[in-house]
Amino acid sequence: MTELEDLPSVGEKTAQKLRDAGFADMMRLATATPKELSVKVEIGEGVAAKVIEAARKAEKIDFETAFEVMERREDVGRITTGSKGLDELIGGGIETQSITEVYGEFGSGKSQISHELSVTTQLPVEEGGLDGEVVFIDTENTFRPERIEQIAEGFGLNIEEVLKKIHVARAFNSSHQILMADKINELIQSGVNIKLIIIDSLMAHFRAEYVGRESLATRQQKLNQHLHTLQTIANTYNVAVLITNQVQSKPDSFFGTPTKAVGGHVLGHASTYRILLKKGLSGKRIARLVDSPHLPEGESVFKVTTEGLVD
């Protein structure tokens, strides 16, 4: 295994700065951009580019065959949602190395799914979990440990142990939200077995802070960088990312869904899976798979009970 000190242009001092900035992992370093590394490690962009290039050579980042990609995808894990129908709709559960976006109107079940997955991630692999811990970035004050207790009881789990494995950050603005996402690298590198990152909700602060067309470009640029960070973490550490999102009305829509997810094309391209949630009759929820690289569109119906999601 190549150490940071083995890379050209990296001495002991630079290696320590890299570790302090969250770049202890060689793959994390190899997938960084020169500008990102320059800012976070406080080195020149020229030096940063050389360090990244050396890390890429050490990790042998190059073209690979489709067969090799298929073999690598065998490492992808999936986390059960608690609903068999919803799991089947999305190919077996929430996928690692991917960003899954769940969007819908208020009360459609977005935060319920977030709380459910905070528990199911901790289940053994044979029971649909990944035997891992969770990061929950809460932007709208929706996280409730009492709800976690109810779901954990439903699975017969030790409530205290479940709560201890959920790392909650209350983000008060978009800059704080971005900072907490950046700090996930440090948490993982410290030895915490993070297997799911939840942001509930992704766009709340961005929408509130960047108002008007004149600020749209800045908002989308920051959002793009934020999503890039999340995808890099997902790829580097084989972690699943779940983001919940708000909707806005489509006044020109005469057919189909009268609402659309906020975040524009930047978010649309970044999300590997997009799931629309709608309220149904008798307390039921309807999940529609809107976008996926390999799965067809479809729908699933589930209910939210005291003990979690059920078919």
UniProtKB/Swiss-Prot annotation:
SUPFAM superfamilies: P-loop containing nucleoside triphosphate hydrolases, Rad51 N-terminal domain-like
Transmembrane portions of the chain: none
InterPro entries: AAA+_ATPase (IPR003593), DNA_recomb/repair_Rad51_C (IPR013632), DNA_recomb/repair_RadA (IPR011938), DNA_recomb/repair_RecA-like (IPR016467), DNA_repair_Rad51/TF_NusA_a-hlx (IPR010995), P-loop_NTPase (IPR027417), RecA_ATP-bd (IPR020588), RecA_monomer-monomer_interface (IPR020587)
Membrane found in the keyword field: no
GO molecular function, one term: damaged DNA binding
One Pfam family, short name: HHH_5
Function: Involved in DNA repair and in homologous recombination. Binds and assemble on single-stranded DNA to form a nucleoprotein filament. Hydrolyzes ATP in a ssDNA-dependent manner and promotes DNA strand exchange between homologous DNA molecules.
Name of the protein: DNA repair and recombination protein RadA
Lineage, top ranks: Archaea, Methanobacteriati, Methanobacteriota, Methanomada group, Methanobacteria
